Amino acid sequence: MKKNKKIFLLISAIIIISLSLIFKYKTNNEKVKTPKADEISSITFIRVINDRGVEKREVYKKSHINKFLNIIKDSERTKKISTSNFPDKEEFIIVAFKIKDGGFIINSIYEENNSIYFEQAFNDIFKLNYNDNLYLLLDNISQENNKEDISVNIEDLLDSDF
C-alpha cells in the first residue's frame, strides 16, 4: 500500500510540474517579444511604399522609446504567422530597434481593416490596441520635425545601418 501511495505521489508531482511548464510556456508565448528599454539606444521608423523607403524618423528619448514599447506590449497575438522579413503590403513601416550592445532588431507595423498590426519577421503578428491610424501613432511617439524624406530600395535598407 505504501509503495502505491509513493508511486501515486510521484506521478502526481510529475503531472503538476509538466502542466506548470506548459502553462508558463503558453502564457509567455502569447506576449510580444521586444527588447527592454534600457537595451535600446534608438528606434528608427521607415515608411515603405511599393518597396521603397520614403520617410525616416528616429527616436532617441527614453520617454518616447518607453511610450512605443508600452503600445506594442499592450497588444494581442493573432492567429496569423509571419512568413517573411516584411509584410506583403504596398505600404508599411519598418521598425528597427538599435541595440546598445550592437546590431538591430527589425520588425514592421502595418494597417489592415482599420487595425494596426505589429509583425515580428518569421514569427508572430500582434494586433495593437490603438484606436488612431498608423501615422498618428508615429506622430504621438516622435516629433513632427523629426521626419526625413528618403528614397531607398528596401533591399538597400537592409544592407544599411538605418
Task: Show where each model-derived region lies.
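Function-determining sites in protein domains
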Residues: 2-12, 18-162
